[in-house]
């Protein structure tokens, strides 16, 4: 580090730097963004290289994706290593602060998301979303989630009716407003590929349309 300079780095590079460091805490401040994606040793590395630390993250986000089998993690007791931020939040004596005002969505969405945060979230603004007339009976004008129930046979990661329904909804949204940013998220890669094929056949390839797994797009902000 150089006095008065800002250094930006990934967890991977920083952890390697900390492992080889002979002089402790060369930085005045270390800020870890997306700290929920850091395993426990990364927090130790952060403390080693910085005199003061600020960890910014959400313990309710998905923990880091690891190669080890889930059963092995459980048997070997590695869960706390993988959920570093949650472990520290539950046991650390350091001051912890939660931001309660959301700028991403309206109050209806904040109420649903707030279930994970003791109903503490408040929306800065609550606009009405009425620019999608063909979806007015499905999507709420106040924003927030909508649950559409459909048959999904157990073990079938590419259910035909659900795939057709998703592509139909996407097509209607684009017909109403072609500039809307849309994300279609799934859990399984096989489901993602099936949806990508069905939606592309329906509306073509678009820069403002993303079909991917939840694990790959944490923190993404879109219209729908």
Where are these regions (language model features)?
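Conserved helicase ATPase core
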Residues: 1-5, 76
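Conserved helicase motor core of SF1/SF2 NTP-dependent helicases
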Residues: 12-15, 23-224
